[in-house]
């Protein structure tokens, strides 16, 4: 249910007051049997698979995650958003990891799993992905185990990878616009101006695009979206999927570049590009006016 978090508890055993989290099970048992170890399994009948969501639900989920991380002032807003970016990075990496039908996702809370063990699994996933892609994050996940557990509970049932690209773009854009307007408003060009500028430039997939002060990556994202729409004109997604992807992905990886002087905003821009399916390796933290 929107805005609420459901918990299923196992009352077949007695748990002490400090052991309540190990009483949580993944889902209600089927036909009065034992509870499943995992709730979310890829494509298997009779159990849950993660699912795409609409814009409003995604915005609400992101806000709940950030409120959990911020904790009424435990972390500064930028630090909380940075931790959220790390966790979303783990979530996307797990969704895109190769797995057979019927295999469970790692990014979820297992039945009777203490916060410590869950946190160890999530941190291990993060470290393995960070090693493969050091361009994105260099720091460890810094939040405590209980907070990490709550954030995982908010995100575990969502399929971010298969959620519509426009939905993700609008949801994260609206969230960041409202969230950063106070401290970092200068880094966010209004999307109407960005859209007008990109439509006027009409970038092609074989041209280079560089934003020397890219902020959160708005110009880069709209340029990528423009080239994606060009791919729609040239190729049919159903019958020419490989050609369609190659058309815009080569542009994202080889022709799209951003420079941002603020390290925190650089991470936001990279996360933005990851959510929009790549191009993040070409965003660097540097003073774009240093050599001028």
Residues covered by each model-derived region:
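An acidic intrinsically disordered interaction segment
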Residues: 39-61
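Short amphipathic alpha-helical segments and their helix-coil junctions
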Residues: 55-75, 151-153
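Class I SAM-dependent transferase core
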Residues: 64, 68-69, 167-192, 198-200
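Core catalytic lobe of class I
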Residues: 67, 77-97
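Structural motif
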Residues: 70-84, 142, 161-166
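Long recognition/docking surfaces used for binding and targeting
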Residues: 89, 93-178
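Conserved S-adenosyl-L-methionine
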Residues: 190-292
